[in-house]
């Protein structure tokens, strides 16, 4: 999935697709085929069938359907592998058509993969989402939190003016300036910015329906102004975000080049533990700190091949004639 994403680029997202759904089905089919040790011919067929099941629209951001893209992709991947094992046929060059369809007609050279190519999960690696909101909000949240550390708000302070200058093409996905639900708030620049300033923390609790409808947050939301840089389309994953905050007698600005959790600004163990604790509290998991500490101790330096070997054994033990 990482290789496909790098191949298609962010233009795929700009066209209105959600890569979790469109690329996830192919990536999940490849992973499942690998775990089951499918013959090469069946593996190729499974990927081709999966490519015909690819779907996921950005238009559904802020609704229950957006997270369902993950399940749809996994379900379609399992079905694709099962059909391939059962003898279904598919084109040998489906990925070429896949690229033509999902890259908006852009001419793409075929990806070059061979046995010597490092796994993308290792090189260049993958990013960890730091906040449970749209990725396009992450740099603005980080910038606001850093400015908040410089200028800590006091109880009773008036709302500050927050000006956000985003990369060209960033505003369209953030389509809810006045969110009415927690899901909509995840895709609201005004809400995420106001919550980052007022609360000082953006976590799962920030995106409950009750939190999204807090009347006390409205005065600050009204002071958030969002603009895009003019000009040609920018790579949304690398283009910086400028945050300017103006309060009584002061004004400060910061340029955030990389999202927290990116390869250039990686999460720390403390960040991962905090994220796990937030998720565990939301899911009412007992003893979250002990579980997470154990995971980090067991897996930090474990070779990827060893992890996949263990996973394959667990899959085969549970599924028996999986996918048949």
Predicted regions and their residues:
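Glycine-rich, mobile lid/loop segments that gate access to catalytic sites or pores
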Residues: 1-79, 93-99
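Terminal-appendage/accessory-domain detector
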Residues: 65-75, 82, 86-324
């Amino acid at each position: 999935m990482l290789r496909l994403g790098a191949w298609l680029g962010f233009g795929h997202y700009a066209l209105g697709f959600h890569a979790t759904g469109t690329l996830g089905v192919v990536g999940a089919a490849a992973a499942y085929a690998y775990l089951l040790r499918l013959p090469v011919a069946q593996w190729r067929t499974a990927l081709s069938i999966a490519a015909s099941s690819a779907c996921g629209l950005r238009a559904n951001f802020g609704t229950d359907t957006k997270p369902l893209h993950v399940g749809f992709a996994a379900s379609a991947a399992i079905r694709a592998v099962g059909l391939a094992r059962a003898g279904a046929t598919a084109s040998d060059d489906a990925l070429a058509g896949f690229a033509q369809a999902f890259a908006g007609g852009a001419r793409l050279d075929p990806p070059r993969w061979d046995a010597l190519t490092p796994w993308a999960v290792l090189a260049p690696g993958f990013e960890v989402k730091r906040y449970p909101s749209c990725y396009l909000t992450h740099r603005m949240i980080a910038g606001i939190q850093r400015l908040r550390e410089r200028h800590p708000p006091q109880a009773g302070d008036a709302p500050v003016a927050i000006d956000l200058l985003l990369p060209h093409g960033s505003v369209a996905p953030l389509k809810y300036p006045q969110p009415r639900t927690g899901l909509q708030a995840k895709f609201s620049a005004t809400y995420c910015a106001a919550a980052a300033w007022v609360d000082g923390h953006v976590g799962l609790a920030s995106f409950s329906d009750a939190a999204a409808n807090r009347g006390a947050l409205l005065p600050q939301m009204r002071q958030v102004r969002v603009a895009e840089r003019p000009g040609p389309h920018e790579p949304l994953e690398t283009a910086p975000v400028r945050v300017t905050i103006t309060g009584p007698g002061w004004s400060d600005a910061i340029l955030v080049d990389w999202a927290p959790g990116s390869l250039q600004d990686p999460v720390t163990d403390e960040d991962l533990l905090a994220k796990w604790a937030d998720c565990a509290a939301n899911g009412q998991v007992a003893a979250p700190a002990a579980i997470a500490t154990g995971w980090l101790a067991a897996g930090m330096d474990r070779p990827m091949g060893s992890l996949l070997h263990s996973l394959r054994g667990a899959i085969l033990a549970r599924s028996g004639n999986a996918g048949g």
